């Protein structure tokens, strides 16, 4: 079932790819080589007693390969806990980054998504 017009999809997909593939994007940890991943991050404050709390829900909705979409993967984490001892290995060759105080989708759900695609991508045979 097609949910959006093909012309709209053709306009949006390159933007979703840039979110993952460029240094200005917020989802570089999902830039798994050979799978042309695109996606959109989302970080939301959870409501509590009519106000917003400091608790987060982080989401990353991804599609791959963006040039000929076959799969979508949505990862949502409820109250993810950043780990100051965790070592993030960038996929673009930059030096690893140790520790994280950022509780945003770009540092939590995107990383999980990248790990999942890295493992299931070869099984799905979706390399472009």
Predicted regions and their residues:
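Conserved catalytic neighborhood of penicillin-recognizing serine enzymes
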Residues: 1-7
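Active-site beta-strand/loop architecture of penicillin-binding DD-peptidases
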Residues: 7-125
């Amino acid at each position: 079932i097609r949910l959006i017009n093909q012309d709209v999809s053709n306009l949006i997909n390159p933007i979703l790819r840039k979110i993952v593939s460029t240094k200005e994007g917020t989802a570089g940890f999902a830039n798994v080589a050979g799978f042309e991943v695109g996606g959109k991050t989302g970080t939301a404050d959870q409501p509590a007693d009519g106000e917003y709390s400091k608790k987060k829900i982080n989401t990353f909705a991804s599609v791959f390969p963006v040039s000929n979409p076959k799969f979508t993967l949505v990862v949502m984490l409820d109250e993810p806990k950043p780990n100051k001892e965790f070592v993030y290995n960038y996929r673009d060759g930059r030096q690893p980054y140790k520790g994280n105080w950022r509780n945003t989708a770009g540092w939590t759900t995107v990383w999980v998504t990248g790990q999942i695609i890295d493992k299931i991508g070869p099984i799905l045979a979706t390399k472009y």
